[in-house]
Amino acid sequence: REFEQMKAVADEAGLETEFIENAAAQAKWPLMNFAAAKAVLWCPSDGYLQPSDLTMAYVAHARRRGAKFLTGTPVRSIHVEKGHVTGVETDTDTIACKTVVNATGAHAFHVARSVGLELPIVPVRHEFFVTVHADGLEPDLPVVRIPDATLYLRAETNALLCGGWEPKALSSDPRDYPLADEPPLIEPDYEVLGGFAEQLGPHLPKVNQLGLRSVFRGWPTFTPDGRFIIGPSSQLSGFVMAGGCNAHGVSGSAGIGRHVVESMSEDTPSDYVRSLSPDRFAANGWNWETARRDAQHYYETYYCLGH
């Protein structure tokens, strides 16, 4: 039933999907064991991208439209006069502007707070691993998600990339480190990573024979209601949020950009875009203890069927 609901959402979005037999799935991923699968939902257009390649594609297109980029130029402060954004201060200059978009990831909380906005943007730890190269792992193998095991996997060239959503998430409190500092260093948690491999074992027996090559980790930000924080703040004219992306910052970036533009340029944005406004937290009382717990819950149940 849950997969049928997923298919209905995909159909509504115009994505081609179909249920396929286990044998057909086995043919697409020969190293995997689909014998116990009760349903396999196939999306031919699914895939993945490299964040750096996507970023450079955005940059190239933006430059063609007249945008300018100042790389290696940190913004030190946002200038505000009489409730309006008037510019930003960099290491070398002051740039006058009427609009600032806060798209700073794990530091989105700090940038918002610097202009007087308190928003529940919670960094939550996420890890994945890449194995050594192995026979049978080819770059064109499909991306696989196993909701019951809260795992995702794909080929990384001729290696295996596997990550998952921890059942007991670890978050950081952004109030504990300043804007000028990096978020806390994450050491690889081999107990968690080993749990991913153990969960994957029945579906991909070969995983237990593959050596570990590298571990990747970071702090994607989550919100207490599991929705983006997008759009202008009524408390400060010209300050626009694009944060709290709930681990969709890269994959959802084009849609997030479209929502940001709609929130800024449309007289009457859609109900959905209005529902993402940062004002929803200003209007409703919240506290950090509850916000962290709720944000972690959305991380922990990221793949939960029936959630």
Which ranges hold each PLM region?
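Central helical "cap/lid" subdomain
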Residues: 93-142, 158
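Mid-domain beta-loop-alpha active-site segment that forms a flexible
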Residues: 40-61, 105-107, 188-199, 245, ...
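Dinucleotide-binding Rossmann-like beta1-alpha1 core, especially the glycine-rich loop
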Residues: 1-28, 150-153
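Helical element adjacent to the flavin cofactor pocket in flavoenzyme catalytic cores
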Residues: 41-99, 107
